C-alpha cells in the first residue's frame, strides 16, 4: 500500500518537478531546526536532487537523483531524517494552521513565589499551503483514528477524539523504530504528542498506547479533571498487537 502511494507521487513529479514535494514538506518545519532553546538540535534531512549531489560529491555516480529516491522520500524512507519534535511541530501546523516555536521555560519564581523571569511564546509561522489541503490532511489523520485496524478499539477507552498516524522507522539489522504522532481534541486542537520507541517494532503496537495515555493526561490536566496521585507504571511484560498497517486512510 505504501509503495502504491509512493508511485502516485512519483508519477506526479513529472508534472510538478523533482523538488516540489520537498518544498511542500518543508512548509511544515521538516528539514529545519524548530528553534527550541537546546544546544545541538538536529536539523534533519528532506532529500532533494541538490542535497544528494552534494552529499555524494566524492562519489558522483552515487549522487544521481533516481526514481526510487522520490518514492522513498514521500513515505519517509531513504535519506529522510526527522526528529520527534519536528513531527510534533508539523502536526501542530496541520491541526491549527500555524507552526509553533517550542520552548522549555515559561517562568522562574523566587522563594517568595514572585515571578522573576518570564518568557512569552515566540510567534509561530503559517505554512504556505491552501486551507483545503489542510482539511484533507486533517480528515485523513482523523480517519486513521476511526478506521485503522485496532487503533479505534484502543482509543475508545479515552474521552477525547484525535487525529493520528502510526509509523515504523526501518534500520538495517535492527528492529523497527515505533512511531506515533497525534493531536487532540480533534475539533479544538490544544495538544500534540509524539512517541518514538527505539527498536520497539510497529508504531501501532508499541508507541500508540503510550502516546494515547500521555494525551489523556494532558487533556485532564488542562481541564482540571485529573485526579489521584501519579501512578507508577509497571514493567511492560506483554505486547498486545493491534491488527493494521497504519495505512487505513490513504486517500
Where are these regions (language model features)?
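Beta-lactam-recognizing serine transpeptidase/beta-lactamase-like catalytic domain environment
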Residues: 1-194, 243-251
Amino acid at each position: 500500500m505504501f509503495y502504491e502511494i509512493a508511485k502516485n507521487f512519483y508519477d506526479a513529479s513529472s508534472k510538478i518537478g523533482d523538488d516540489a514535494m520537498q518544498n511542500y514538506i518543508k512548509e511544515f518545519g521538516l528539514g529545519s531546526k524548530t528553534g527550541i532553546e537546546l544546544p545541538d538540535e538536529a536539523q534533519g534531512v528532506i532529500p532533494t536532487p541538490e542535497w544528494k549531489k552534494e552529499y555524494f560529491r566524492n562519489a558522483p555516480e552515487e549522487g544521481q537523483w533516481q526514481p526510487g529516491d522520490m518514492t522513498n522520500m514521500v513515505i519517509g524512507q531513504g535519506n529522510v531524517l526527522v526528529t520527534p519534535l519536528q513531527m510534533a511541530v508539523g502536526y501542530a501546523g496541520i491541526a491549527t494552521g500555524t507552526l509553533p516555536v517550542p520552548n522549555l521555560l515559561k517562568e522562574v519564581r523566587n522563594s517568595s513565589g514572585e515571578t522573576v523571569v518570564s518568557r512569552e511564546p515566540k510567534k509561530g509561522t503559517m505554512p504556505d499551503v491552501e486551507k483545503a489541503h489542510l482539511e484533507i490532511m486533517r480528515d485523513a489523520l482523523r480517519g486513521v483514528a476511526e478506521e485503522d485496524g485496532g487503533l479505534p478499539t484502543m482509543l475508545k477507552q479515552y474521552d477525547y477524539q484525535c487525529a493520528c498516524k502510526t509509523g515504523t522507522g526501518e534500520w538495517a539489522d535492527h528492529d523497527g523504530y515505533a512511531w506515533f504522532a497525534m493531536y487532540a481534541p480533534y475539533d479544538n486542537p490544544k495538544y500534540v504528542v509524539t512517541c518514538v520507541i527505539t527498536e520497539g517494532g510497529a508504531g501501532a503496537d508499541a508507541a500508540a498506547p503510550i502516546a494515547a495515555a500521555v494525551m489523556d493526561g494532558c487533556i485532564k490536566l488542562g481541564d482540571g479533571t485529573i485526579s489521584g496521585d501519579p501512578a507508577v507504571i509497571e514493567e511492560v511484560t506483554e505486547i498486545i498487537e493491534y491488527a493494521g498497517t497504519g495505512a487505513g486512510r490513504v486517500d
